[in-house]
Amino acid sequence: MNSKKVNWIFLSLILLNMLMYVLMLVCYVQGILLFEMNILVNLLLAQLVMMLPAILFALAFRRKTETGHLNEMLGFHKIRVSSFFMIFLFTYLIMPLTTALNAISMLFVENEVTAISGDVLQMPFPVMLFMIGMFGPFCEEFVFRGVIFRGYKNSGPVFWSIFWSALLFGLMHLNFNQAAYAVAIGILFGLLVEATGSLWSSVIAHMIFNSHQVCLMYLSDLFQADLAAAEEALTQEMLIAAIGPYLIIAAVATPLAVCVLVWLAKNERREAEFCSIWACRKMKKEAMVSIPLIIAIVISLAYMSLEWILALL
């Protein structure tokens, strides 16, 4: 697997998403309902569409030197128990940064998570905790920190492999709100994988992050808080006032998260690999950007822009 194959994977992923949206729209207009569409079906279809091209490409274009099982090829290595608990700390330390980025994006676009909260809350808590908090994160990490990141890593410096896999992770969400903080999460999770040497670390962190959001959503509902109505009541001035404190907290918490990454690298005996991320950033192997990647990025940004413009009308 290399960058060229990875770029085709992402283009396939985006095109499949577009095809799914068109088919669903046609079925809705024509009154054709093969099954009841709800948030659960939407989430399941989205993950399957994302996983399909990644699995097919990973199996079909596995390098001759990669003779092990797929889980070994993608970096599903064991981590120490102490590292497992420090990943919890790392995940909560990066939350102020993601919250601040989310709030900044809300100055311009709608909060996508809040927008679907009503649909989510109609489902049983255990079902949504599994789908959003466990299944979704596993699929996304398998694709972006597994197949895509490692494909780029075979072609270029780790520094740029982390950047490109994070950028594509953000674009995959196909909306500016989630993309704003998904890119930051992607970079931090990429660093986490390099610090521990295991894809399980980012899977665990992603599960903690999403599960935390799901729990907050249901707790708010338990206390009769209407998230959608609360967001509509937010003014620009209120958002700007909230961003400041979050940025201050993030300015303290994010460096601490980096310290945790350094500790994890030492704990997993990967100090040399982790330190080389920045040192080897100018090393060149193969071109990481190709025509399929450019096409995929243009399609993603065009869709996101169109959705944003339509929301303003």
Can you describe what each PLM-predicted range is?
Residues 2-18, 41, 67-97, 241-244, ...:
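Interfacial transmembrane-helix boundary/kink motif in multi-pass membrane proteins
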Residues 15, 45, 135, 164-168, ...:
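Hydrophobic residues within alpha-helical transmembrane segments
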Residues 17-62, 245-254, 313:
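Alpha-helical transmembrane segments in multi-pass membrane proteins
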Residues 23-26, 178-242:
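Functionally important transmembrane alpha-helices
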Residues 33-43, 70-139, 154, 302-313:
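Juxtamembrane helix-loop-helix connectors linking adjacent transmembrane helices
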Residues 139-164, 191-198:
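Membrane-interface helix/loop boundary segments of multi-pass membrane proteins
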Residues 157-177, 186, 207:
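Small-polar-interrupted transmembrane alpha-helices in polytopic inner-membrane proteins
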Residues 211-313:
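C-terminal membrane module of polytopic membrane proteins
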